[in-house]
Amino acid sequence: DIVYGGGRITATIPTPGIHMVMHSLCAAAVGLTLGIEPELIKQGIESYAPVEGRMQIIKTQRLTLLDDSFNANPTSMAAAINIACRASGRTVLILGDMLELGEKGAEYHRNMGKKAVECGADIMIGKGPLMKNACEETERAGIETMHFDTSEDIMRALDNCLRDGDTVLVKASHGTNLKDVAEYIKANF
């Protein structure tokens, strides 16, 4: 519910994440300030649909894929990990490098490994030199961990890794090409 001076808007946000609640509240505040009818604000919030590769929730025959492969930064990756860990089934994280982070890149990636441990991920699959830092954290904590240099190697490993009922997050900067992995999962699981 969005409560404002003149009333209440009850709307359901069709995508997960506290950050989406914040975005919806901001949009509603702007709309109300501009005099947009509350019913139109409700319709706008409830008709939201993510674009390809931006936290698309895809139910395949065997599992749930969270395709967030288009881009990544430390804040968006932490939010995506939280969403994945709250879903049903085993949590499988397929995370690629977050690019253009400068001197703190290794630290930011280590923090993603710690986040995966904190939220109780079951499997961590990393891609890229920076994501090795996250994989070291998850492996140290006893989480089943794999690291690969190519998307093709990840795809080969998935056949022996994924199970019915899993929730699989695919998240990375666009330049790591994890979109190919998301497409493989859609087509084969």
Region annotations inferred by a language model:
Residues 6, 10, 16-189:
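ATP-dependent carboxylate-amine ligase
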Residues 2-4:
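Internal nucleotide-binding/catalytic subdomain
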